[in-house]
């Protein structure tokens, strides 16, 4: 499933609904793939959906959930593998994408240590991070990164890899870390065998390596021809090395496979020459790389610089620009969203692009489709926006077939058949039929989603089945569902039926802002729903509010004020609210109003959250901060007062550091609740 529209055109509630749907699908596929070696879908389908989820969560960080598959650094801890607590956390790296960002990194290093430094520059191998522990020279444990603190014991699988030494050349007790990967030749051989066996092929070498290494059957791993590069030792004192470069050389002498391409660079000009050299040789290397890693060479300076809760301060990853690939458009599909917007998506021949197989790309709207002049049968060039979202760059006109058909822009809704319109000069094509089946289903899906009424266990699949059986049509119908009706859903036995009935019943008690969000009012997302609930307190008050009163609220403009007044004063809304009242849905705001917030540390401050949290989910921490008077935003700017950074924070942390914004880790942030 490609995203139905551009990220910047989405409302947060729409993004949340899409993301939750993707999480449920990916969780099921991932378990089948990793624990049973029995994938339900081809890898490129998994990759597409995973890329969509990553893009949504990066654009709308407030929708990230602690259990999201994207928040597991190395995935879930699988049943059948023993959990391993790392002696030192296996931290992630910060990413940069330009020379200017490398200059900023170098400036920070020089400012902190007081002088220029040498860098050891290494290729960023596209594989799976591993840890190896040796006692008296004997391999006693190998593990995956896992969530960074706890990984999986895969010692038996790692022992099947030829480049992992069972015994070192010296009887040392050390822990080293590196990357397990599948060489390109091995990947081609594996996929050829998969095809011969009638099994789906792997989308890319990294996925193949990860799936092969995390097998419950070690014989499967042994046949997959994996390899390793070791690049760090946890305690460099055990080797007596003074520099990163020297440590890698010493690890090679111990019997580890290390990458010979590392170089010591005295300045950024030399670093950039290294980048240019290997970016040009990227396709010729026998293994996959997606960038280079820049590390302060002096190990004592690494210790001095230290790390944040999530990333070392002494290293950075430079990611290569997105690749382009050519493919052929075979169809253009039109889908209908919750608000009636009809979106075109190009369906293409599958093609490898930046490490994944791509077969779909959204064209967002008719104007973009016509501006890019995309026709069925065209050869197009693709790239990945942000290395995540597949996007058509342009049509290769010289390859356009003679007599190609003209663009077929729909004039009627593909779901209900009613005529499509452009409202108020909108670019989007829109179906304005309130009884359009696709819109009804999408509205119901949104109503039950995590950021709206949060009815756990009620996903798109269940909504679609309930609608198809004519059990639900309006929001209040959800609260009239019976156990007999729910038992007709696929996979619903007594326990699952009871759990869903309980979740539906619990949603009646939600605070008003969730209901407002669930109603799907144009221009109203999670944040605006809370503003309305805090300001007006009850649904009855909202129903009686005029355009002028809405417009008087600081964060509400004239257009939104008109939308709100039109909606709440309509007969449709009145009937909808009356029906929801009749089934016992709460109509009052239950949270703390801003005026009632304590005069504490966060009162009146603009706060941004980033990275993975341990003690709170993102939404829980956001709710707590709001109750303390904070204004929680989604992006870092000069107006940001505080950045709360969990594990694996990325560009927001880098930007906050550059702007001199106060940065707190989760523990520090929680400690200030009482200040």
Swiss-Prot record:
Catalytic activity of the protein: NAD(+) + (deoxyribonucleotide)n-3'-hydroxyl + 5'-phospho-(deoxyribonucleotide)m = (deoxyribonucleotide)n+m + AMP + beta-nicotinamide D-nucleotide
InterPro entries in UniProt: BRCT_dom, BRCT_dom_sf, DisA/LigA_HHH, DNA_ligase, DNA_ligase_AS, DNA_ligase_CS, DNAligase_adenylation, DNAligase_N
Residues that coordinate or bind NAD(+): 43-47, 92-93, 122, 145, 179, 295, 319
GO cellular component, one term: cytosol
Keyword Aminoacyl-tRNA synthetase: no
UniProt-listed SUPFAM superfamilies: BRCT domain, DNA ligase/mRNA capping enzyme, catalytic domain, Nucleic acid-binding proteins, RuvA domain 2-like
Active-site residues (renumbered): 124
Biological process according to GO: DNA repair; DNA replication
CDD domains attached to this UniProt entry: BRCT_DNA_ligase_like (cd17748), LIGANc (cd00114)
EC number annotated for this UniProt entry: 6.5.1.2
Name this polypeptide is given: DNA ligase
Protein source organism: Pediococcus pentosaceus (strain ATCC 25745 / CCUG 21536 / LMG 10740 / 183-1w)
């Amino acid at each position: 499933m490609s995203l139905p529209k551009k990220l910047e055109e989405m409302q947060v509630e729409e993004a949340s609904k899409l993301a939750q749907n993707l999480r449920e699908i990916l969780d099921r596929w991932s378990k089948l793939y990793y624990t049973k070696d029995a994938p339900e879908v081809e890898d490129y389908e998994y990759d597409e959906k995973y890329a969509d989820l990553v893009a949504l969560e990066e654009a709308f960080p407030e929708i990230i959930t602690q259990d999201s598959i994207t928040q597991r650094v190395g995935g879930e801890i699988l049943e059948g593998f023993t959990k391993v607590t790392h002696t030192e956390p296996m931290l992630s790296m910060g990413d940069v994408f330009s020379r200017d960002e490398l200059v900023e990194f170098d400036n920070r290093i020089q400012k902190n240590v007081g002088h220029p430094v040498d860098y050891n520059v290494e290729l960023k191998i596209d594989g799976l991070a591993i840890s190896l522990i040796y006692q008296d020279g004997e391999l006693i444990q190998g593990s995956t990164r896992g969530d960074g603190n706890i990984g999986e014991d895969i010692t038996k699988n790692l022992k099947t890899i030829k480049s992992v030494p069972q015994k070192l050349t010296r009887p040392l007790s050390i822990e080293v870390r590196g990357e397990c990967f599948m060489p390109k030749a091995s990947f081609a051989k594996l996929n050829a065998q998969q095809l011969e066996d009638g099994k789906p092929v792997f989308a890319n070498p990294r996925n193949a390596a990860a799936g092969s290494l995390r097998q419950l059957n070690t014989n499967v791993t042994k046949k997959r021809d994996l390899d390793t590069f070791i690049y760090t030792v946890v305690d460099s004192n055990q080797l007596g090395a003074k520099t990163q470069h020297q440590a890698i050389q010493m690890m090679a002498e111990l019997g580890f496979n290390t990458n010979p391409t590392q170089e010591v660079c005295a300045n950024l000009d030399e670093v950039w020459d290294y980048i240019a050299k290997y970016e040009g040789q990227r396709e010729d290397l026998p293994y996959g790389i997606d960038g280079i890693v820049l590390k302060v060479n002096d190990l004592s300076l690494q210790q001095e610089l230290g790390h944040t809760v999530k990333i070392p301060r002494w290293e950075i990853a430079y990611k290569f620009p997105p690749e382009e690939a050519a493919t052929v458009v075979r169809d253009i599909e039109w889908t209908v969203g919750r608000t009636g917007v009809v979106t075109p998506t190009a369906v293409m021949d599958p093609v490898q692009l930046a490490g994944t197989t791509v077969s779909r790309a959204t064209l967002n709207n008719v104007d973009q489709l016509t501006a890019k002049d995309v026709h069925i049968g065209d050869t197009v060039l693709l790239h990945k926006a942000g290395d995540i979202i597949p996007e058509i760059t342009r049509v290769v006109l010289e390859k356009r077939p003679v007599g190609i058909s003209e663009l077929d822009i729909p004039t009627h809704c593909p779901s209900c058949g009613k005529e499509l319109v452009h409202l108020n000069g909108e670019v989007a094509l829109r179906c304005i039929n309130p009884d359009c089946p696709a819109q009804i289903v999408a509205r119901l899906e949104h109503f039950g989603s995590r950021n709206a009424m949060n009815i756990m266990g009620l996903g798109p699949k269940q909504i679609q089945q309930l609608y198809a059986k004519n059990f639900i049509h309006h929001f209040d119908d959800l609260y009239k569902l019976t156990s007999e009706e729910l038992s007709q859903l696929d996979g619903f036995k007594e326990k699952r039926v009871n759990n869903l009935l309980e979740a539906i019943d619990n949603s009646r008690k939600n605070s008003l802002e969730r209901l407002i969000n669930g109603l799907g009012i144009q221009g109203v997302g999670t944040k605006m729903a809370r503003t309305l609930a805090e300001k007006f307190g009850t649904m009855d008050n909202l129903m009686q509010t005029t355009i002028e009163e809405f417009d008087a609220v600081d964060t509400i403009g004239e257009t939104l004020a008109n939308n709100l007044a039109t909606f709440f004063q309509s007969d449709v809304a009145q009937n909808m609210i009356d029906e929801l009242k009749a089934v016992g849905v709460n109509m009052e705001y239950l949270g703390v109003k801003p005026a009632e917030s304590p005069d504490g540390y966060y009162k009146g401050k603009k706060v941004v959250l980033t990275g993975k949290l341990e003690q709170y989910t993102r939404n829980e921490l956001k709710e707590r901060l709001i109750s303390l008077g904070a204004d929680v935003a989604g992006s870092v700017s000069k107006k940001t007062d505080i950045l709360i950074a969990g594990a694996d924070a990325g560009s927001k942390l880098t930007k906050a550091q550059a702007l001199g914004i106060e940065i707190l880790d989760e523990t520090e942030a929680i400690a200030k609740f009482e200040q």
